[in-house]
Each structure stands twice: as structure tokens, then as C-alpha cells.
């Protein structure tokens, strides 16, 4: 894990600069008075979804929506006011061409179309829920692998395979979306496998060209297998702590505070029980998020420290009347204006216990935030697929527009990590790729084959998990 830890530590040293993103975190005094007190109350009240409304009512809701976004949306300046102004103009022009009675479904779809720049790059954001899944399916990246097609890697970094005693070296792929990635198999071997990580529409048939020492070429077709997330009811807690002969298994599928607070507090405390383990399997597959305070507390308990556990980032909280009303009072000092921005420099922690974190593309929001927090520890390996990619804008709220009942969801806090690249709908790549549905069995086989823990411990833990 030495090379992986070096990579994680290097990532921690990158903090997006407030100067580089000055436009995205700028103060906007004009936005402070965009919503009246009655409009704020109306947004927070909740309204029934309508089938049709008058043109005047539709226009009123459109105006309210765009003023609400400017006032309270954490990524408003990140995308830029000119894009939102153009979107509002497009919807307004469309309304002017319609009959006096407006179908709410048609309006919702038009809003989605005009705000595609936002919805395609902010996974938490939602405008008009009935068609939200269709939008996500178009912009979501998927992980495919060429099952049964494996390479080895030599000391020079070349990928090759041996057929009938002859070495064939990777020359090229037919598709720019294809790459070679370290991949964990069910028998515990780590190989190098052709991997396609792309939008579903780009998952086309591909080929690979190999060459021997004399330059002779062979072309093979690559048949893609789509990876599968863990089959689990999303949003359930499913907290488990299983320990056997030095092997610790921890699973948690949600960090949502409220209903499960007592169990989450227990989970956080029991991080201490993993101390002294020979290895820890930390299963975050299917963890849809909630509050990242819980994984922070687990890590503190595991390390035996009260020091802050932070990933390096730049964050900017939008201070608005809507935010203040929803939270009873503003959480920000008045002298910060409409935007409170800070650079956070993460801290690296030494740790000699191997921690293998299992992820899939349902691991999102503070679920994948937990993955990033765990990467501030030495000896951590992330195994599975890409995470979900719900990172750009957090502290999520849902509102309904008063006349149409159209649902609106967005966050008030902008988060930028590493080099500032937006990972929404793409997620974070694992250190070692593995079909998530097989990740647990594959990791148990790896630990057994490497002699980290006993075969009996692996089998006992597996049996207890499937019970």
C-alpha cells in the first residue's frame, strides 16, 4: 500500500485556492434582498403538485425560482449569473408562446432543459422530480470491464500478456475511453484489465491491438461487462461490526442523522474496537450519505484522538434569508456578507493497520466524503468502482414552488477538492477496480492469499455477513 498512500498524501497537499476561484465564491450584495419574507415562508411551506396553472402563475413561479437560485444556491456564482439569466429568458420566451393554460409537466421539462448546465454538473440539484432520473442517466458515468482479459505489467510500465509462450505487448485501444486499470479478481489476484469508464452512450464495442517483439500485430475484440453495485436497500443503516481473529468488518449504508442517531453514535464509538486489528474491511457500498460528522467521529475513535479529521478543500457557504429561515437563524456572521469562504488544509495521520474500503456507484455525498476522509490515513486502499459523484454542492434543502408545486432541490455550500475538478456524476476512482457486487469476496481472498489474516477468519466473517 506504500504507493497508494503516497498518492493519497499527495492529493491531501492540494488545496483549491480561493484566489483561483474568486468569481465562484464572490460576495453578491444584490442577492440579499431578492426574496421577500412571504416568499421565503411560501418556499418552506410545501405545496401540492398541480396539473395545470395559468400563464401568470407559471411566470410567477419561474421568477421566484431564479431569484431563489441567485439568493441561496451555493454554486450560483460557480456556474455564472449569465447562464442563469439566459435560462430564465429561454423559459420566459417559451411561456409567452404558450396558451393561457400551462401544463406543469411541460413547464418542468422546459426548466430542466434550460438548466441542463446546472443539473448535468451538480448531482444533488433537482428541478421537477418526475424526469430527474432521465437526466441523471444521460450524464452518469458507468464502469465496464473486459471480463477474462488480463495484462501483467513489467518494470518499464508496459502491459503485456503471454500466449503460447510468446509475449504480446499492449499497443493501443480503438476507443479513447478505454484504459488499463489495476483490478482485483475474485481469487484475490490483482491484475491489469481493460476498463471502460464512460457515459452509457459511449459504451460501444472496442478492440485492443497487441504486438510481439517483431512488430507483428493482433487485434482482439473487447466484450464489455457492466459492473453492478451491491444489492441492498438504499437508505437503510445496516450497521455491522464483525470481528474474528484480527479481522474487523464494518458496514454502514447511511449517515443520515435523526432516526438512527443512537446507532450512529454507537458506530462512531466502536471505531475504537478496530484498534489492534490485523486488517479492517470498511464497507461503504450503498452508503447514500447524510452527515459527515459520523465518519469523522469513527476515525477519531479508531485513532484515539480528538484532533480534527479533515480533507483538503475550499468551501463557500451562501448566506441567505432562505438559509437563515430554514435553520432558525443564520449560521454565518453578518459581516461575512452573502458568502462565507474558507480554505481547509487536511492533516495526514499515521496508521499501520491495513484498511480496505469497499465502494460502489451508490456510495455518494457524505458516503463518498467518508472515503475521502479515510484517505487521510496511511495504509488505506479503496476497492470497487467509482463512487456516485455527489460532491459539488452540499447542505441540501428541498422546496416547492407555490403555484405549480414543482419540486426544487439544491445545496447552499460549494465544495471544491484537490485541483478543483468537479466530480459530480463521475465520482472518485478507486485505487483498485473491482466489480462492487464481488468486492467483499475478492478482498477476503486477497487478505487470505497475502497471509494478512487466516483463511478461517475470512470464512467465519463471510458466513456471519451472509446470515
Regions found by a protein language model. Give the residues of each.
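Flexible, low-complexity junctional segments that flank or bridge functional domains
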Residues: 1-280, 286-288, 297, 395-398, ...
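Active-site-proximal beta-strand/loop segments in catalytic clefts of secreted hydrolases
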Residues: 251-255, 283-287, 312-319, 358-362, ...
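Extended C-terminal subregions enriched in glycine
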Residues: 354-376, 381-389
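Low-complexity, Gly/Ser/Thr/Pro-rich intrinsically disordered linker/tail segments
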Residues: 421-467
Amino acid at each position: 500500500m506504500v504507493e497508494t498512500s503516497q498518492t493519497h498524501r499527495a492529493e491531501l497537499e492540494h488545496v483549491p485556492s480561493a484566489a483561483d476561484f474568486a468569481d465562484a465564491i464572490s460576495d453578491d450584495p444584490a442577492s440579499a434582498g431578492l426574496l421577500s419574507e412571504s416568499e421565503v415562508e411560501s418556499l418552506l411551506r410545501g405545496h401540492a403538485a398541480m396539473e395545470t396553472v395559468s400563464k401568470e402563475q407559471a411566470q410567477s413561479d419561474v421568477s421566484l425560482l431564479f431569484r431563489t437560485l441567485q439568493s441561496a444556491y451555493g454554486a450560483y456564482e460557480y456556474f455564472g449569473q449569465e447562464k442563469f439569466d439566459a435560462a430564465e429568458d429561454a423559459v420566459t420566451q417559451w411561456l409567452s408562446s404558450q396558451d393561457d393554460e400551462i401544463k406543469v409537466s411541460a413547464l418542468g421539462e422546459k426548466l430542466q432543459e434550460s438548466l441542463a448546465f446546472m443539473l448535468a454538473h451538480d448531482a444533488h440539484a433537482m428541478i421537477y422530480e418526475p424526469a430527474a432520473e432521465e437526466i441523471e442517466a444521460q450524464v452518469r458515468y458507468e464502469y465496464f470491464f473486459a471480463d477474462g482479459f488480463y495484462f501483467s505489467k513489467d518494470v518499464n510500465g508496459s502491459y503485456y500478456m503471454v500466449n503460447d509462450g510468446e509475449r504480446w505487448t499492449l499497443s493501443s485501444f480503438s476507443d479513447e475511453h478505454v484504459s488499463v486499470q489495476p483490478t482485483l479478481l475474485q481469487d484475490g489476484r490483482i491484475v491489469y484489465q481493460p476498463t471502460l469508464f464512460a457515459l452509457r452512450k459511449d459504451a460501444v464495442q472496442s478492440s485492443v491491438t497487441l504486438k510481439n517483439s517483431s512488430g507483428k500485430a493482433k487485434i482482439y475484440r473487447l466484450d464489455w461487462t457492466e459492473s453492478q453495485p451491491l444489492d441492498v436497500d438504499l437508505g437503510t443503516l445496516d450497521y455491522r461490526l464483525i470481528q474474528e481473529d484480527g479481522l474487523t468488518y464494518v458496514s454502514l449504508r447511511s449517515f443520515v442523522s435523526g432516526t438512527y442517531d443512537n446507532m450512529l453514535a454507537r458506530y462512531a464509538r466502536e471505531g475504537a474496537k478496530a484498534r489492534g486489528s490485523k486488517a479492517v474491511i470498511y464497507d461503504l457500498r450503498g452508503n447514500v450519505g447524510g452527515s459527515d460528522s459520523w465518519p469523522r467521529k469513527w476515525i477519531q475513535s479508531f485513532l484515539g484522538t480528538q484532533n480534527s479529521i479533515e480533507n483538503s478543500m475550499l468551501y463557500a457557504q451562501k448566506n441567505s434569508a432562505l438559509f437563515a429561515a430554514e435553520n432558525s437563524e443564520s449560521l454565518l456572521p453578518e459581516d461575512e456578507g452573502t458568502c462565507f469562504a474558507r480554505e481547509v488544509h487536511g492533516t495526514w495521520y499515521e496508521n499501520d493497520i491495513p484498511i480496505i474500503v469497499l465502494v460502489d456507484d451508490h456510495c455518494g455525498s457524505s458516503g463518498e466524503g467518508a472515503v475521502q476522509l479515510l484517505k487521510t490515513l496511511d495504509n488505506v486502499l479503496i476497492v470497487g468502482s467509482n463512487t456516485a459523484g455527489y460532491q459539488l454542492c452540499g447542505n441540501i434543502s428541498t422546496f416547492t414552488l407555490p403555484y405549480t408545486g414543482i419540486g426544487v432541490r439544491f445545496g447552499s455550500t460549494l465544495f471544491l477538492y484537490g485541483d478543483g475538478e468537479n466530480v459530480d456524476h463521475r465520482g472518485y476512482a478507486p485505487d483498485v477496480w473491482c466489480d462492487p457486487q464481488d468486492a467483499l469476496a475478492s478482498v477476503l481472498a486477497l487478505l487470505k492469499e497475502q497471509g494478512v489474516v487466516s483463511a478461517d477468519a475470512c470464512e467465519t466473517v463471510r458466513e456471519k455477513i451472509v446470515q
